């Protein structure tokens, strides 16, 4: 095993994001732009550090493209900028579950309670052409999806969602 650092034009880095691959490109969604969240409850997971773009990276050419998520419905755009979503790719579809972050609609930090299906082929094409991305996301809302920091896997035709937790309100690394 060997690892080599690579610089991607226009990409500053992310933390705790979801990733998929399509057409030899990486698709990055969610996470934080400010590195590890701060440990003080009043400052942890500030909305200012949310990743508010869907980013496409071509690792061969070292190019990147992005599209903002502000025009998506709030329930989708808020979840897409959360941290530690569970994610799994099946074919041309990326599934995103839960994630933790600030919700303007709730007026507080929440663990999101939905599953979002992302159509990768259309999304990548739209982002590279500077088009609209709205039609490439579908969402199902159910409290069963309110998880962050879990893992999802697939054995045969069955998906398994394991572990994780649900935080409501400001995250406190020192306990309740």
Predicted regions and their residues:
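Beta-strand-rich domains and repeat architectures in extracellular enzymes and scaffolds
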Residues: 4-52
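Beta-propeller blade signature
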Residues: 42-63, 108-129, 174-176
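Beta-propeller and closely related beta-sheet repeat lectin domains
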Residues: 15-19, 78-87, 146-152
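Aromatic- and glycine-enriched pocket-lining scaffold segments that form the walls
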Residues: 115, 127-176
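Glycine-centered tight turns/hairpins at beta-strand boundaries that repeat
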Residues: 22-41, 96-106, 159-175
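Blade-loop segments of beta-propeller domains
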Residues: 8, 43-95, 101-103, 141
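A short helix->beta-strand "capping" segment at the edge of beta-propeller domains
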Residues: 1-11, 67-72, 132-138
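Residue-level detector of Asp-centered blade-edge/turn motifs that repeat once per structural unit
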Residues: 21-24, 89-92, 154-157
């Amino acid at each position: 095993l060997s690892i080599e650092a690579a610089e991607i034009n226009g990409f500053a880095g992310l933390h705790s994001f979801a990733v998929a691959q399509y057409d030899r490109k990486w698709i990055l969604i969610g996470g934080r732009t400010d590195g590890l969240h701060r440990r003080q409850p009043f400052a942890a997971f500030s909305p200012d550090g949310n990743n508010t773009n869907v980013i496409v990276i071509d690792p061969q050419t070292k190019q990147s493209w992005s599209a903002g998520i502000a025009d998506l419905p709030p329930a989708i755009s808020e979840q897409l900028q959360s941290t530690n979503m569970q994610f799994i790719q099946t074919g041309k579809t990326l599934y995103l579950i839960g994630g933790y972050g600030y919700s303007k609609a709730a007026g507080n930090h929440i663990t999101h309670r939905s599953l979002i299906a992302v159509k990768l082929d259309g999304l990548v094409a739209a982002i590279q052409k500077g088009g609209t991305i709205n039609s490439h996301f579908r969402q199902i809302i159910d409290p069963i999806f309110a998880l962050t920091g879990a893992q999802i896997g697939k054995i045969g035709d069955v998906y398994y969602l394991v572990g994780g937790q649900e935080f409501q309100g400001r995250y406190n690394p020192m306990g309740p």
